[in-house]
C-alpha cells in the first residue's frame, strides 16, 4: 500500500536583499463530514470540496464519560483484552444475514470486528470451511475525536465496513485489484499558471513583507486540485481514511502541522540549492512487513512487521504541466521518508489516523492473500451478502473530488521553492511477492493455527479468544 506526495520546486534568482522565500503549496483529500479521524475531522460538501476541521477535548472529560458508558454497555467477554482473538469472516457474514432477515440492526461487536486492533494472522480450515483472521483485541468506545478505540490501549479498532471494502477489492469473482489509490493533482493549467506566477515574482523586487501576497498569488495560480480515487469506491470510509492520512502527512511534511512525535519534515531538511528546477517529490506509503510468513501448506499467514513505510521519487515537470518520473529523490525527501517510516508506529500510537491507515493495509493484504490462495473457492464462500451493496452498503459518503491548496511560507537561504503534492497508493500484493513472503519452517504459524478450536462455539458465534 502506498501514499503519493508531490512537491514542485522552482529555484529563483536572488532578490535584492538575497532573502528567499519557500512557499509550500500543499493539497490533499479527506473524509466526509459525518466521520472524523485522527486528532480532528474533515468535511466534504455536496460538490466534493474537502475542508479540514479540528475536534479537541483538551480536558479529557468527554473521553472519561464515554469510556464509562461503554464499559457498562459492552458484555464482559468482548471487553476482555486478548492477545489473539479470532474472527471467522464467513461465519460472521452468515450471522449478519440472519440478523438482517430478522430486521435487527448491526450490533457493535460486529460493526467493530470484535474489538480487533490489528490483523496478524489469516487461517483457512478445510474441515470446517472457516476463513479466520486473528490479532490483538479489546473492548472499545467512541472517544472525543469520534474515533472508536480500544479501552486499554486507545488503538483504533477494525471496522467491518472497511474489511468489506477490502474483501470486495479482492473478492471471489473479481480480478486482483492492482492498486488502491488516491491522487491529488494540480491541473496542467494550474502548473502553467504557477510557472507564470513564479516568473512574475522573479521580475519583482521581492521583500519579506510580501510573503502573504505571494502565498495568495500562488494559491490563485494553482486553483483547485483534482482528487482521484481508484481501486475502491470514493464514497467509502476506506477511501476517506486513505485520503485523510495523505492530507495530514503532507501537513507534517511541509511544516503546517506538528507531529505528536519527532519527525524530520521535508522543510527541516530542504536545501534549496539542491532542489532542481521544475522537480516534484513524490511520496507514497506502501506495506512494510519484515516478512509475510506462510505455512508450508499455504493455509495460514502471519504478518510480521510495522505495516507501513513512506517512500518516494522525484519527477520533472515539462511544458504544459506534463510530469515524468526520474527515479531519484533529493536528500530532504529521503530524510523525511526515513524519519516518517522510523517513527510511524510511535506516531500511530499518538494519532489514531495513522493506525487506521495501517489497519487498511493489514486488511488489504489479508484480503489479497485470501483471494490469491482461493480460500473463497475452497470454502464455497461467494461473499453473497457482504459483496452486495444493497444488502451491506458501504458507499455512504460524499466523494472527495477537489481541494484548494494550502500554503506554508518559510524563509530559507537564497532560493525560492514551491512544493506541491498529493496522493495515496496502496499495493497490498507487494507484500505477497517472493522476496517478502517466506515459508515458515519453524512450525510457529502451524502451531498458532492448530490452537484455534471450533468445538465449543455456540450457534451463531463467529468470534472467540
What are these regions (language model features)?
Residues 9-12, 23, 126:
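Intrinsically disordered, low-complexity regions enriched in small/polar residues
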Residues 17-31:
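Bacterial N-terminal signal peptides
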Residues 35-465:
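Outer membrane pore-forming secretion/assembly proteins and partners of Gram-negative envelopes
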Residues 1-16:
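N-terminal secretory signal peptides that target proteins for export/translocation
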Residues 1, 30-36:
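Domain-wide signal for the mature, well-folded portions of proteins, strongly enriched
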Amino acid at each position: 500500500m502506498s501514499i503519493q506526495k508531490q512537491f514542485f520546486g522552482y529555484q529563483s534568482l536572488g532578490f535584492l536583499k538575497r532573502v528567499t522565500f519557500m512557499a509550500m503549496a500543499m493539497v490533499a483529500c479527506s473524509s466526509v463530514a459525518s466521520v472524523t479521524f485522527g486528532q480532528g475531522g474533515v468535511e466534504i460538501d455536496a460538490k466534493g470540496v474537502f475542508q479540514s476541521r479540528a475536534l479537541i477535548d483538551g480536558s479529557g472529560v468527554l473521553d472519561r464519560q464515554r469510556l464509562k458508558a461503554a464499559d457498562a454497555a459492552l458484555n464482559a467477554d468482548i471487553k476482555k483484552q486478548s492477545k489473539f482473538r479470532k474472527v471467522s469472516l464467513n461465519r460472521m457474514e452468515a450471522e449478519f444475514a440472519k440478523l438482517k432477515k430478522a430486521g435487527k440492526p448491526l450490533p457493535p461487536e460486529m460493526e467493530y470486528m470484535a474489538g480487533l486492533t490489528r490483523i496478524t494472522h489469516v487461517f483457512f480450515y478445510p474441515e470446517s470451511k472457516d476463513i479466520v483472521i486473528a490479532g490483538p483485541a479489546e473492548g472499545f468506545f467512541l472517544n472525543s475525536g469520534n474515533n472508536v478505540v480500544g479501552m486499554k490501549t486507545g488503538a483504533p479498532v477494525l471496522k467491518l465496513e472497511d474489511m468489506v471494502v477490502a474483501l470486495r477489492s479482492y473478492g471471489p469473482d473479481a480480478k486482483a485489484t492492482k492498486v488502491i489509490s488516491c491522487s491529488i493533482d494540480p491541473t496542467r493549467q494550474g502548473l502553467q499558471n504557477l510557472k507564470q506566477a513564479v516568473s512574475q515574482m522573479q521580475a519583482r523586487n521581492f521583500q519579506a513583507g510580501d510573503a502573504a501576497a505571494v502565498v495568495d498569488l500562488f494559491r490563485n495560480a494553482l486553483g483547485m486540485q483534482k482528487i482521484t480515487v481508484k481501486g475502491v469506491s470514493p464514497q467509502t470510509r476506506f477511501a476517506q481514511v486513505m485520503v485523510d492520512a495523505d492530507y495530514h502527512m503532507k501537513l507534517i511534511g511541509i511544516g503546517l502541522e506538528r507531529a505528536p512525535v519527532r519527525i524530520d519534515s521535508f522543510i527541516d531538511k530542504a536545501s534549496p540549492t539542491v532542489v532542481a528546477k521544475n522537480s516534484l517529490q513524490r511520496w507514497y506509503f506502501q506495506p512494510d512487513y519484515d516478512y509475510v510468513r506462510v505455512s508450508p501448506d499455504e493455509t495460514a499467514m502471519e504478518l510480521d512487521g510495522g505495516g507501513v513505510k513512506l517512500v518516494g521519487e522525484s519527477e520533472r515537470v515539462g511544458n504544459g504541466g506534463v510530469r515524468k518520473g526520474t527515479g531519484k529523490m533529493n536528500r530532504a525527501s529521503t530524510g523525511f521518508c526515513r524519519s516518517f517510516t522510523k517513527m510511524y508506529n510511535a506516531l500511530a500510537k499518538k494519532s489514531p489516523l495513522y493506525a487506521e491507515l495501517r489497519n487498511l493495509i493489514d486488511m488489504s493484504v489479508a484480503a489479497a492473500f485470501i483471494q490469491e490462495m482461493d480460500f473463497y473457492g475452497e470454502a464455497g464462500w461467494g461473499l453473497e451478502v457482504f459483496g452486495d451493496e444493497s444488502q451491506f452498503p458501504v458507499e455512504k459518503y460524499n466523494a472527495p473530488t477537489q481541494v484548494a491548496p494550502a500554503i506554508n511560507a518559510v524563509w530559507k537561504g537564497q532560493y525560492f521553492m514551491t512544493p506541491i503534492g498529493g496522493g495515496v497508493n496502496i499495493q497490498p500484493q507487494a507484500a505477497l511477492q517472493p522476496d517478502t513472503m517466506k515459508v515458515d519452517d519453524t512450525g510457529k504459524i502451524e502451531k498458532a493455527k492448530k490452537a484455534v478450536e471450533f468445538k465449543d462455539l455456540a450457534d451463531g458465534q463467529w468470534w472467540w479468544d
